[in-house]
Amino acid sequence: MIEIDGSFGEGGGQILRTSLTLSALTKKPFRIYKIRANRPKPGLQRQHLTAVEAVKKLTNAKVKGDFVGSTELVFEPEDIVEKGDFEFDVGTAGSVTLILQTILPLLINRNIKVTIKGGTDVPKSPSIDYIRLTFLSLLEKIGIRVNLILIRRGHYPEGGGEIKITEVKGNPSSFSLMERGELLMIKGISHVSSLPSHIAERQAKSAKEFLLSKIKIPVEIEIDVRENERSKGSGIALTAIFEKTFLGSDSLGEKGKRAEIVGEEAAKSIYEEIISNATVDRHMSDMLMLYASLYYGEYIGSELTSHARTNSEIIKKFLNVNIQISGEKPFIFRAKKEL
């Protein structure tokens, strides 16, 4: 059984999520201890338990220690199920995108439909529009096509969001994202839920003005206004579309934060990614690591975070893969077959 120190490195929920995904794919059981030991609320929280429950159901796993506050978990998976219709509720505003990240590799070419309820646009996790604009676009580049439907948005603290994954198809193989090609345009989505539409418009205007002051390319930002949602909130996500890759950013509104600041934050963030010469943005360089390790890929990430470093160490525990990381800002990630 693979033993994992949950307080190692960055020491957050990502260690558990990566372990769950790879345990399911390799059918290797693991024990994780000292879960989130250095965090203000140590142990498993509702968010993490939903990830455990999701992979447990998708693999008929035997699990010990799956309760709130638990600092140790034993996970023994069986084969991934071939078909089914599943629903997972993260509760209030727990992130649906972190659950999606955990289970997505398990769904490839299986007749499985999944509904995830919770927060779609919440702090400390990728927004649903970042996922749709950047993450899924990059997955398509490496041969994985995901059909994702956003049914309702959910913001912190009320949540109430819902997404559906109806199909994940693909034939992923080794990939190289070492060149960007020309920057073609920037696309985005600026949204509000149960708030005046001018907030979304101001976010978009501010982002567009900042970007056009820096680069002369087309900027198209769609306005998404949703009324009568359970939660109130706003946000914006942007993606820079290159000939060979996508770079993304996002920013969320909050009480007392002007819409113009929200828009400018996302614009500044994507501009920094554009001038970094990376082929994959800061968030994506962490998220893509798993896929690069499974299918032998290489890319240039804009910044090597402690999150990403920790992730690479967990991957090595499950996969017999030769991982090479060089540089920091930007950094090159390469995964090759272990000879």
Swiss-Prot record:
Location of the active site: H307 (tele-amp-histidine intermediate)
EC number: 6.5.1.4
Binding residues annotated for ATP, in chain numbering: Q101, H283, M284, S285, D286
SUPFAM superfamilies associated with the record: EPT/RTPC-like
Keywords: ATP-binding, Cytoplasm, Ligase, Nucleotide-binding
Keyword Translocase part of the UniProt annotation: no
GO cellular component terms given for this protein: cytoplasm
Family in the record: Belongs to the RNA 3'-terminal cyclase family. Type 1 subfamily.
Record-linked NCBIfam families: RNA_3prim_cycl
Database matches in HAMAP family: RTC (MF_00200)
Protein name, UniProt field: RNA 3'-terminal phosphate cyclase
Organism: Sulfurisphaera tokodaii (strain DSM 16993 / JCM 10545 / NBRC 100140 / 7) (Sulfolobus tokodaii)
Lineage: Archaea, Thermoproteota, Thermoprotei, Sulfolobales, Sulfolobaceae
